[in-house]
Amino acid sequence: MEEGVQAPDWDSDETVIEGSVTESDLEEKELPWRRLLFDQDASLKSEFSLHPDTRGMCKGMPSPEIQLGFKLREDLQEQMNKNKMMPVLSEDTILQSQDETERNQALLQTRKNCSMFIGSFRQSGLSLNHQNIEGPEAESPEVLPHIEKELSEGRDSPEVSLLSGTAITVSDTVAVKETSLVEPEKILAAPNTFFEPRKEVTMTMTSEETKDEESSLETFVSALESLLTSPESTQEERLFELVSDFDRKELMNPLSDSLSSISIPLNSWSACHRDLLEDAKDDALPAELLEALNTLSEAKVETICHRKEGGSSLIARNECLEVEFNTSQTNEDCTQIAETLQDPNPSGLQTLAHQNITSCEPLSNKRNSNSVTNSSDQETACVLRRSSRLEKLKVSRDAKYSDHMYKMPEKILPKILGCEDLTNNNSSAQNFRMQDPALMIDGKEKNMHSARFKNGKQIRKNEQFSGKKEKMKVNKISLHSINRRNIFGENLVYKAALHDDADLVHHCIKKGGNVNQPSYAGWTALHEASVGGFYRTASELLKGGADVNIKGLYQITPLHDAVMNGHYKVAELLLLNGADPLFRNDDGKCALDEAKDLCMKRLLERYIPKHQKCLTSAQRSSIDPLDIEDVYQHKKPKFSSKSHIWHVYNENSNRQKLEHVKVNKGSKASLFINKEDVYEYYQKDPKNTKFGKSKHKQSTLDQIYSTGLRKGNLHNVKDPNTNVPKGIGRRKTQHKRTQVDDVDCNPRKILAVSPSRRINRLVTYQQHIPETHNDLPEELCEPSSLTLSSLRNGLDSSTEACSVSKEKHIQNLDLSDSQEVQCLELESVDQTEAVSFPGLLLHKEIKLPVVTTDKQPHTLQEQHHVLYKSHENSNLVPKDERFNKWENSFLSFVKENSDNDDDDDCSTSEKAITSKKVLCSTGGKKHYNFKENLTNKKEMGFQQFLLSEDHLSQENELKAVSLTTLPEQEAVNFSYSDNAVISEHVANYEQCIFGPSFDHSNGNPEQNSLACMRTLLTHEASKLTNHVELFKKPQDYIPRAPTFLMNQTDTHIVEKMAKNCDTERNYIDRDQKIIYSNEPLSIVAHSQVIETTKVEKRRQNHLESETIHNIDSHSTDNMSKELANISKLSQREKKEISHKPGMKAGRINKRNARGESQLHLAVRRGNLPLVKALIESGADVNLNDNAGWTPLHEASNEGSIDIIVELLKAGAKVNCENIDGILPLHDAVANNHLKAAEILLQNGANPNQKDQKQKSALDEADDEKMKELLRSYGAIETVNRDESDAIVNEKIPAVRSKRHKQCFCDDGKTIDSSSLSHQERSRESLSVHQTLSAILQDIEEKQEYLLEFEIRNPEDAEQYIEKMLKIKKIMDNVLAKQKAERDDLAKKYRVSIESFKHGALREQLANLAARQKSLLVVAKKQKKISLKIQNCRNVTSLPCLSLRKLPPRSEISSEKDSQELTSLENLEHPQSGSLSPVSGSMQETQLSLETWNYSQNTNICLNSEAVRRGEFSGNDMNSKQNGSDCTLDGFPKSRHSDGTEKNKLPSQPVAFIGQTEYSQKENDLTEATDKDHEFYVSSPVIGKLNISETASVLAENAAHPSNIICDQDLSNYDPKRGNRKTSSQQSPTGASESLAHQGIAVLGSDTVHQMKPYLKKSVSVVPCADDSQISSSSGSGQQDTIKKALNYSTAPKKKCIQIKDLILLGRINPGNNILEFKTQETTHKASILLNGKLKVESGQIYKNPVTWLKDLLGGNSYVTWNYAWSKVTYLGKELLRYVSEDAPILPEPNSVPQQYQPCLPEVACLDDPVQEPNKSMFEKTKFGQGTSRESMQSSPRYLQINEILLISDQEFLPCHIMDQHWKFCVECEELTP
């Protein structure tokens, strides 16, 4: 690609073939133009020039290759065919220009095998010092055919392979020897996996060869271009376009000015890189290569670095080029799909670039001394690609792979960097690798890289073209392109999944891509998605039909991968889709065995069948936990590091380029302070210093992410150490052998940014880089010698340090991506567990003191970290001591940093923390040194942390240390702009605390987590306990982790995880403390997160899921994992709420057929982690399913306390109702979840809110403790439990009918579930007929039981009544249903009579008739049941007492039953109404009144409902209506039925028909009023309604009771609130009327019968306005009056008679405008209300005609009763006449109440049914429930009680206390009169 000669300038005559050109020679000046237009030409797109500037070699001479290149372009397809036909690349083809096409194709094929590309060829003849190209090909001819086969199959275009990483040209290794004429050329050797190993091709380019070389390069490029035209080249085309943007000059900066060109193909770099990954043996560079590299001018190195930083550097351009290549190489590990180019991972790009650069390292191993040769494994490409994965699975999966890859790069890197300009190939190769993330992330970056274009416009055009074309290409991807497999057997779906391109995966699946196609190594796309924790991608694959249990290599399933890598969400997704958690791989381990995190284990256990759980647990218990930990550590670091790094660089690539660079710049003070430290430190070593600077710039330019890493490495001495260790940390076990040196030597962790695919490799790469660097070795080697021992302590401290530093850098870069950073830290911690890097750290720290104070903080951090590590490695106690001191100093430093950096660099403090972690890994010696340094620094900056320091002083040293650490983190968190990072740190911190709390205190959450895992040992546990204690106070003191639930979760986890009781307690305490302290930090983090999220927006969805997974997998410590998740989730919640709350809302809130969201399902399963994840992802916590249930309902029903807390924190409404009005509190109480109920009550749940059944939570409670809890929160219990039950039963139907009335009216075939009992609900799915028949049958059974039930005492009677009322309620509902269905059928019949002769309507009609008969039978039985209870009451010696004790509802129920029977019978036989005994009916009526009084609102609703129904009903409907009203109201039905029976239906129908319209209005009013009454109407209103209703009922019996009732109810009801007033005015009348009823009842059975219905009707009417007054009058007034009434006067004077009396007698019926008063001027009309009052057109209500006339005639006018009654006419007849016609005249209304009261005792008979009801009503009135203003007037002593009732109870006493008083009054016999 590049030629060794440096291009003199960027002239347009560069030999790069960038545009399609005809065979004719083109002017050199046309090339740039072609290049610009390259993007526009589709054919051109596929072309790209691998060599940046062959012209430079020719020095201005156009290369003949250009023509050839153009020719190739002109006929790309033909050339492609030729390429396919070329089995072997021969020297002749290369030498012959006419065969250039084939030659290029062959080269491309060879490149496919070997990513290495020999940049310089002579056109006429390349002189190969060792072998001709033909030789190597001959040696491995089979490789070429294989490549051709691949190409022919469309698997991979040769250009892809060319870019891939092995150069076919070099069979085993390509060694480019420096010619004598030129400086040692840079030799790029890429192992040729396809060719036999150990075959070397050495190409020596002389100055003479430059022209030929150019032409050959051109030819090669053209061949590549032609190959790019392959269908797969769509992705690659992007790369080539990018390449076209690059100047060859950049690509090939000659190593020297000599003409000889070094052939260092990008492919060779990538190949070397891959080979290195594959072959760990290639760690050492050959001596020759090292010499050659060393010869490279250092100035160039610096310059190159500088360029990178600048952004216009070769690296940047090379990166672009490299990206292009990688795109073509999409099949390769390091390469990405064209879609991947879009992947925003600048860090990945840098990583690739670095890797590519490092790929030169392969040259060092197994190369002939004469040439730099890469010893490439003979494994197939797929093996190469997958070998990393296999290694990862075995050792650390990707860790080893990355180790090799990184090792060599690290070694080579310094020199490569030095030679970067010289060897443009290196940079191009580097760029090539980097291309994936960087370019993909930003097409714009391509343009940036193509700085070679002097014209920025041209660059922009190229970008636009490439972007547009890329989109078009994606859309145009064909199915065969998707399913075409590359050399590794990977199709496009696989590659897209590998790079977490969910959109591309979706597109491919949509196009028909095979989601289950395995690669040659046996892995599928789902495996890759699971390994990387790519939730979206995995979800898309599963949606596309991916086999969730598909087996990969070694029988590993995706679930294994997800669990081993700690990807919780992905694992849960797999489990939800049927993954088998017990499936075992070849090692005999199932996913559950691989899980080391408690959350993950719990997740898996939930999906294990119960019968298998015991076996599984037993098996797992048999495994040595230590072994498991070790295995897990190996695996986890691999995965975690990989996933974390991947995640980080993904986010970083986007943000780092966008924001990270800025952040780094902004945080230069902190990050760069470290850098300065490093710089100063490195100044001793000029190379290092230069490199550090240049590297930093370079990293900044290349990848903000890598820059951050590099920065950290370069900036902080510890960072270089740390950074190296960071890389090492990931593969610490792998790097143990020599990585300490590498780490120490490597300031270039920047390079550590591994290929986009495997960040682990990046780490390894970084580690190796130090080895490679000769610059750093001087400095780093010294510490490395120290660190070797420490590294080999079992955990490479250097590795750890590297990981940490790397994480640090990532964090700095990823300020916005704190989560990613956290993951990285966790990884690093895992890998950095062993602090074996003390030497480096010591060295750094020692020099840190020299560094500025800012640097010192970093040093302190590092020191602290090192100390901590050494503690872990060596002794916990010494560590504690050192740690305490160091920590204190560090705290002060951290505080300083945080204070100083908060403004600019939040990341700085965080970095410092990271450094600290790394430092902890240093040896104990260094710890002491650090201590000293820290002490000094401590003095300097600890003052800021005096408080924390005080805390520390209060605590023991360990405590102090941990505390200081907490402040550090705290400071870091605050200073750190990225909220996510902070939360992660905190989470890790806490996690570590849970494990070894001291770890967290050290500030290295990840390391601490791992350490904690290991320290679970007994002695370590004790240490941990101490740390935990320390942390407790620090946490209390410091608001760190921003998660409230963390403490609960942590406590939970701790309980399970902690092997130590002490540790467990400590954790718990600490968690609790943390909860309070967390919030401030979370808030700060939140604000910071908002800033960072701007950068993250594109990747937020992916990052969220990935971050969560990464967090889970990264923390070795289960506790730490969960804590991290929790903190992340909470912070994410805030984050999402702040900026992108609804990003995933669409998917997350997606519902199933039942309307349930994922959150509903997760809550029902009790999956707390998933619930948190969903909430954090923006799930709607108040989303109702189809039945109205919310997640809080589900959690309350299950009693899941933790989930309830989570939901409430997320904003769940505590008083949300379902369609039946059921609250979460009802569910918790009904299921006896005491704790859940308490939490709900604490959060504002209303204990008095009732459902549609009118049951409150207290009514649902069966447990005394639950009742007490509810009462303590103000729950009010009904005065009488039995009454309340009865009332509830009566109310429920009314409310339900009210709510679902439309269902009944509109559709007779549907039964409203709310109106049915629970038994009915269970049958809702059945047909209407079957349901109703089943209900009736069930009722019959219950009735039989009641008939056999023996009533022995009042308790039995109460139970009996309760059951009777339930039956009655059901019957009412059935009756309403019957009625609605009948009406529906009648309408249909009127529309089409013929339709009933056949078909469904006829069957429906027959069913209706059958059910009607059954209902009649049931009604008769119900009447018997009601008579039974009545007889029992009559028999009792103390009927009053029995009535009292048996709540009036019992009477009511009996009354209802009898009435219901009556109504039912009336349906069948309207005229023959079965009348219950007069006494019985009266009792029922009175009882019903009492019940209404007690129930108040309930009765009102029911009665109003009944009234409505009555209005709806017609003739027969009236009886049914009455029945339905009774059904709904319970009492109303009986009253209607009784009245109907007496009046007989015929009379009723007329009345109803006459007032149909009115009744309908009344119904509407009733509905509205019912609701109002439920909330507003008090008992007085009920009483009023009862009386008025009674009056109306009497009138109704006489004439048209239903009609009257409706009218009165309407009139009373219309005013709603005004009704109360009106009724209160007429309440005395109502009382007298009730007395009159009673008197009538005594006088005669007919009257009694009438009275009974009246009373019943009054009960039903109670809902209307008069309800309260009537009930009160009928209650208190009636009882007193009844006692006096009969004796006082049986035949009162005429003037004493009132309209209400006439209504009771049936002579007058209520109605609208039926009373008239004529004057000369006009006629005044008034309406008669049910309560006997008059209502005029203006709406004003008068008690009687006298008051009406007084108002009309004037206030001063005197109007006598005779005058008024003689002048006011009713239906044209004076009222006085109706009075004269009356034989028995009722007492005068005004005097009746008082007169009757004294007389009642004389007349009253206990056996008298009338008297009994009166007593019961009186009792109710006495208690104030039935009292009203009327009763107040009649009995002033109750006035105050009434007032109290009218006012809310809360104004006087708590509801539950008042309820107790009322209950006492009811039960107390002494209070009865």
Swiss-Prot record:
<comment type="function">
    <text>Required for DNA double-strand breaks (DSBs) formation during meiotic recombination. Regulates the spatial and temporal patterns of pre-DSB recombinosome assembly and recombination activity by acting as a scaffold that anchors REC114 and other factors to specific genomic locations, thereby regulating DSB formation. Plays a key role in recombination in the pseudoautosomal regions of sex chromosomes.</text>
</comment>
<feature type="region of interest" description="Disordered">
    <location>
        <begin position="1449"/>
        <end position="1482"/>
    </location>
</feature>
<comment type="subunit">
    <text>Interacts with REC114; the interaction is direct. Interacts with IHO1.</text>
</comment>
<dbReference type="InterPro" id="IPR036770">
    <property type="entry name" value="Ankyrin_rpt-contain_sf"/>
</dbReference>
<feature type="region of interest" description="Disordered">
    <location>
        <begin position="707"/>
        <end position="740"/>
    </location>
</feature>
<dbReference type="GO" id="GO:0005634">
    <property type="term" value="C:nucleus"/>
</dbReference>
<keyword id="KW-0233">DNA recombination</keyword>
<feature type="repeat" description="ANK 6">
    <location>
        <begin position="1220"/>
        <end position="1249"/>
    </location>
</feature>
<feature type="repeat" description="ANK 5">
    <location>
        <begin position="1187"/>
        <end position="1216"/>
    </location>
</feature>
<feature type="region of interest" description="Disordered">
    <location>
        <begin position="361"/>
        <end position="380"/>
    </location>
</feature>
<feature type="region of interest" description="Disordered">
    <location>
        <begin position="1606"/>
        <end position="1634"/>
    </location>
</feature>
<feature type="repeat" description="ANK 1">
    <location>
        <begin position="488"/>
        <end position="517"/>
    </location>
</feature>
<feature type="compositionally biased region" description="Basic and acidic residues">
    <location>
        <begin position="1535"/>
        <end position="1544"/>
    </location>
</feature>
<keyword id="KW-0158">Chromosome</keyword>
<dbReference type="GO" id="GO:0007129">
    <property type="term" value="P:homologous chromosome pairing at meiosis"/>
</dbReference>
<dbReference type="Pfam" id="PF12796">
    <property type="entry name" value="Ank_2"/>
</dbReference>
<dbReference type="GO" id="GO:1903343">
    <property type="term" value="P:positive regulation of meiotic DNA double-strand break formation"/>
</dbReference>
<dbReference type="InterPro" id="IPR040843">
    <property type="entry name" value="RAMA"/>
</dbReference>
<feature type="repeat" description="ANK 4">
    <location>
        <begin position="1154"/>
        <end position="1183"/>
    </location>
</feature>
<feature type="compositionally biased region" description="Polar residues">
    <location>
        <begin position="361"/>
        <end position="379"/>
    </location>
</feature>
<feature type="region of interest" description="Disordered">
    <location>
        <begin position="1"/>
        <end position="27"/>
    </location>
</feature>
<dbReference type="InterPro" id="IPR002110">
    <property type="entry name" value="Ankyrin_rpt"/>
</dbReference>
<keyword id="KW-0539">Nucleus</keyword>
<feature type="compositionally biased region" description="Basic residues">
    <location>
        <begin position="728"/>
        <end position="737"/>
    </location>
</feature>
<keyword id="KW-0469">Meiosis</keyword>
<feature type="compositionally biased region" description="Polar residues">
    <location>
        <begin position="1460"/>
        <end position="1482"/>
    </location>
</feature>
<feature type="compositionally biased region" description="Polar residues">
    <location>
        <begin position="1515"/>
        <end position="1525"/>
    </location>
</feature>
<protein>
    <recommendedName>
        <fullName>Ankyrin repeat domain-containing protein 31</fullName>
    </recommendedName>
</protein>
<feature type="repeat" description="ANK 2">
    <location>
        <begin position="521"/>
        <end position="550"/>
    </location>
</feature>
<dbReference type="GO" id="GO:0000785">
    <property type="term" value="C:chromatin"/>
</dbReference>
<keyword id="KW-0040">ANK repeat</keyword>
<dbReference type="GO" id="GO:0010780">
    <property type="term" value="P:meiotic DNA double-strand break formation involved in reciprocal meiotic recombination"/>
</dbReference>
<feature type="domain" description="RAMA">
    <location>
        <begin position="1683"/>
        <end position="1778"/>
    </location>
</feature>
<dbReference type="Pfam" id="PF18755">
    <property type="entry name" value="RAMA"/>
</dbReference>
<feature type="region of interest" description="Disordered">
    <location>
        <begin position="1242"/>
        <end position="1263"/>
    </location>
</feature>
<feature type="region of interest" description="Disordered">
    <location>
        <begin position="1512"/>
        <end position="1549"/>
    </location>
</feature>
<feature type="compositionally biased region" description="Basic and acidic residues">
    <location>
        <begin position="1250"/>
        <end position="1263"/>
    </location>
</feature>
<dbReference type="InterPro" id="IPR042334">
    <property type="entry name" value="ANKRD31"/>
</dbReference>
<feature type="repeat" description="ANK 3">
    <location>
        <begin position="554"/>
        <end position="583"/>
    </location>
</feature>
<feature type="compositionally biased region" description="Polar residues">
    <location>
        <begin position="1621"/>
        <end position="1632"/>
    </location>
</feature>
<keyword id="KW-0677">Repeat</keyword>
